[in-house]
């Protein structure tokens, strides 16, 4: 059984996207990272421990993140739609016929958009830490993380190592501004209109102590993605898949089978 992880870059939609791949199972699974995220910083325990006999696991770095640079990351109004198309086109380029999605935070939003827009290509989906719209409360939360010098050392360090301080700090500010754009749309809409179009079996995991995603966001997605299942982790915060990796991985494996 090979536990090796390969990394490569492949040309997709005019950029070179970096990804890591492991396992040799029939069932292809794409890991979608959060803001400023990458496979290596966001999904260590999943790349290492998800069942390699059952799954072929791919973790991608969205354009401008991780090792998918250049280009520098930017945030046009449709940046999440662009990520969704890039992600699906990456997996098609790698010759996967169908794929399940594991999306964290922004990656969860990207997964929802991909499942809605490319329903025939998506097998199953697990999302956590995502939101379908922006509120005043969210705006305050995001302003609170705008200045990376105020982040905890533990959260900041891996990203600083990956990007260098300047790119990391600048891109975080750009991300906050990028998210603000949704405040100007009716109801702060990010992807509300797409939720009813999701057809695949969907598991929503929520850490009840997540400081970044208030509970109403989760209930909204659960209500509007038909047939979705909600699993609550009472002690989970935003990074529940890292903090409670074994519990999370088992949950995911059971759901995907």
Positions of the model-derived regions?
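Active-site nucleophile elbow and catalytic-triad environment of alpha/beta-hydrolase enzymes
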Residues: 177-194
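Active-site loop/oxyanion-hole signature of alpha/beta-hydrolase fold enzymes
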Residues: 44, 59-98, 102, 250
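Catalytic histidine-centered segment of alpha/beta-hydrolase-like enzymes
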Residues: 236-249
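Acidic catalytic loop of the alpha/beta-hydrolase fold
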Residues: 209-213, 238
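Catalytic histidine neighborhood in serine/cysteine hydrolases
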Residues: 222-239, 254
């Amino acid at each position: 059984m090979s536990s090796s992880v390969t990394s490569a870059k492949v040309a997709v939609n005019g950029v070179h996207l970096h990804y890591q791949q492991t396992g040799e199972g029939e069932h292809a699974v794409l890991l979608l990272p959060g803001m400023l995220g990458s496979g290596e910083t966001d999904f260590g325990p999943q790349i290492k421990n998800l069942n390699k006999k059952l799954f072929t696991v791919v973790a991608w770095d969205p354009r401008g993140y991780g090792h998918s640079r250049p280009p520098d990351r930017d945030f046009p109004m449709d940046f999440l739609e662009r990520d969704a198309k890039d992600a699906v086109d990456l997996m098609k380029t790698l010759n996967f016929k169908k794929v399940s999605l594991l999306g964290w935070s922004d990656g969860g939003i990207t997964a929802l958009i991909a499942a809605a827009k490319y329903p025939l290509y998506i097998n199953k989906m697990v999302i956590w830490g995502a939101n379908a719209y922006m509120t005043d409360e969210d705006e305050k939360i995001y302003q609170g993380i705008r200045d990376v010098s105020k982040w905890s050392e533990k959260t900041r360090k891996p990203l600083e190592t990956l990007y260098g301080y300047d790119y990391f700090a600048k891109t975080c500010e750009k991300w906050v501004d990028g998210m603000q754009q949704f405040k100007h749309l009716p109801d702060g809409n990010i992807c509300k209109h797409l939720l009813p179009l999701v057809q695949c079996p969907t598991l929503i995991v929520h850490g009840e102590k997540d400081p970044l995603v208030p509970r109403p966001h989760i209930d909204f997605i659960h209500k509007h993605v038909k047939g979705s299942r909600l699993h609550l982790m009472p002690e989970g915060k935003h990074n529940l898949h890292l903090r409670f990796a074994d519990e999370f991985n088992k949950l995911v494996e059971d759901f995907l089978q």
